[in-house]
Regions:
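Charged, flexible boundary elements
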Residues: 2-15
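Conserved non-catalytic scaffold segment of RNase H-like nuclease domains
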Residues: 13-24, 29-128
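Acidic active-site catalytic centers that drive phospho-/nucleotidyl reactions
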Residues: 27-29, 134, 158, 187
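Residue-level signal for well-ordered alpha-helical scaffold segments within enzymatic catalytic domains
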Residues: 109-112, 116, 136, 140, ...
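Substrate-recognition/cap helix-loop segment adjacent to the acidic, metal-dependent catalytic center
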Residues: 114, 118, 132-154
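Acidic, Mg2+-coordinating catalytic module of metal-dependent nucleases/exonucleases
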Residues: 125-131, 136-137, 171-209
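Active-site catalytic pocket residues across diverse enzymes, especially alpha/beta-hydrolases
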Residues: 142-146, 166, 198-202
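Short, flexible loop segments at boundaries between secondary-structure elements
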Residues: 150-170
Length: 209
């Protein structure tokens, strides 16, 4: 090596590791099945893979008044409303009774919550079952009230696809059930646990270097 030659430290040549993805499970309760329908509850949890199981790091829930949905131009689907009337009393009251907010505030609060979860350069993963339902309806509601969303179409992940892949890899554990079905937050919690358990299972199948 000449006097002008020098070697860079190995660490300087290696890219800095990316921060882990911010994983969020989203669940909506609605009065329709198409974009533009009324959103009556938004539930979400931030979850992570830790040790032998998942961990819930943060939670979000807003229930929304129908009056505000109507004022925003969101519609009510009669068959969906009739379906709600057949659900257990606890599910109905958890969504349609108690303290509720308007759809403007709900969309603003949710997008701010998602934005505040992020870290610089940390990828965002928004999970749903399926995203074709929750993503499109949530984005339509946000658009109706003029709230920009802090995610792109590549940020969404499909729990149903993960379920199929894990099953093909031999996953057979029973699913975690929500403490109260059709409660947006309870559904999001259960779905987060089910996603995390499958992700951990698939990780265990990857050969160690």
């Amino acid at each position: 090596m000449s006097g002008t030659d020098f070697a860079l430290p190995t660490a300087a040549l290696e890219p800095a590791p990316k921060p882990p993805a911010v994983m969020v499970m989203v669940d909506l309760e609605t009065l329709g099945t198409e974009p533009g329908c009324a959103v009556v509850a938004i539930g979400a949890v931030q979850f992570a893979l830790q040790g032998p199981g998942p961990i819930i790091r943060s939670e979000f829930k807003r229930t929304v008044t129908l009056t505000s949905c109507a004022r925003a131009g969101l519609t009510i689907n009669a068959p969906t409303l009739e379906w709600w009337l057949t659900q257990p009393y606890e599910a109905i009251t958890s969504t349609f009774a108690g303290e509720r907010t308007d759809v403007w505030s709900a969309c603003k609060d949710f997008t701010r919550w998602v934005r505040e979860l992020g870290a610089p350069d940390a990828p965002l993963q928004l999970w749903a079952k399926p995203p074709q339902f929750d993503q499109k309806i949530l984005e339509a509601a946000c658009a109706a009230v003029g709230t920009p969303v802090p995610w792109g179409h590549r940020d969404w992940r499909d729990l149903r696809t993960l379920e199929d892949v894990a099953a093909q890899a031999g996953y057979k554990l029973p699913d975690t059930q929500p403490a109260l079905a059709h409660d947006a937050l309870e559904d999001a919690r259960a779905q987060a646990y089910n996603a995390a358990k499958r992700l951990l299972y698939l990780q265990s199948k990857v050969p160690k270097p």
